[in-house]
Regions:
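Short beta-strand "acidic-cap" motif of Rossmann-like dinucleotide-binding folds
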Residues: 27-34, 39
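Hydrophobic residues embedded in beta-strands of well-ordered beta-sheets
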Residues: 77, 181-182
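Conserved structural-core and active-site-/substrate-pathway-adjacent residues in large, well-folded domains
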Residues: 7-9, 17, 75, 156
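Generic structural signal for residues in well-ordered beta-strands
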Residues: 30, 166-168
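Conserved N-terminal/central alpha/beta ligand/cofactor-binding core
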Residues: 38-42, 46-163
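Gly/Ala-rich phosphate-binding loop of Rossmann-like dinucleotide-binding domains
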Residues: 18, 22-23
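Beta1/beta-strand and adjacent pyrophosphate-binding region of the FAD-binding site
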Residues: 1-13, 31-33
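A conserved short coil-to-beta-strand element within the FAD-binding core of flavoproteins
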Residues: 144, 168-181
Length: 182
């Protein structure tokens, strides 16, 4: 099959890349290759009784699959340039924050509505820190929680699944040019 765009990985970068490409150019033929399983098939065998620790599965359902390594996290999304990455070094602080807020809006639209956005800016705690020569980093944090984080991923997949070809359990080890494609 030939694709206009082939995305490697269905973690947040791959999911949001596919999402934006679908929105901006719905005629593109998009494929996503993911080493792990679909979200609904991601199951870790550790159960605390018969399997108490990692058994080294060929494909780790905690680290790989739709949603990436954060799929089963507590769903905290930081909106800040003060920590967590250096995107702002490439596109500027305002643009980086605007993009983080845009991702937050998408998360809200796909199941995260009703969750709380916390902030350190302008708080009594921030003032107390300054008075005591402590330097609290400014951040807004959306706390979706584990369950809502999963719902957001389910809803994003439901939106994308008929617009993008997902190929799960398809690790990519190398890329080679074949004719005019790869």
């Amino acid at each position: 099959m030939n694709y206009d765009v082939l995305i490697i990985g269905a973690g947040p970068g791959g999911i949001f890349s596919a999402y934006e490409l679908v929105l901006r150019n719905p005629d593109l033929k998009i494929g996503v290759l993911e080493a792990g399983h679909p979200l609904n098939k991601r199951k870790c065998p550790i159960n605390g009784t018969t399997v108490k620790s990692c058994i080294g599965c060929k494909t780790c359902s905690i680290m790989s699959g739709f949603g990436g390594a954060g799929a089963f996290s507590d769903g905290k999304y930081n909106i800040t340039n003060d920590f967590g990455g250096t995107l702002f070094e490439y596109i500027g602080k305002k643009r980086a924050l605007d993009l983080m807020k845009y991702v937050d809006e998408i998360n809200m639209a796909y199941g995260g509505q009703g969750t709380k956005l916390y902030t350190t800016a302008g708080t009594k705690f921030k003032k107390l820190c300054i008075q005591n020569d402590l330097h609290l980093l400014d951040a807004s944090v959306r706390h979706l929680g584990t369950d809502i984080n999963y719902v957001v991923l389910e809803n994003l997949y439901a939106y994308l699944q008929d617009k993008v070809d997902f190929h799960f359990d398809t690790p990519v080890r190398s890329i080679h040019q074949v004719g005019d494609g790869y």
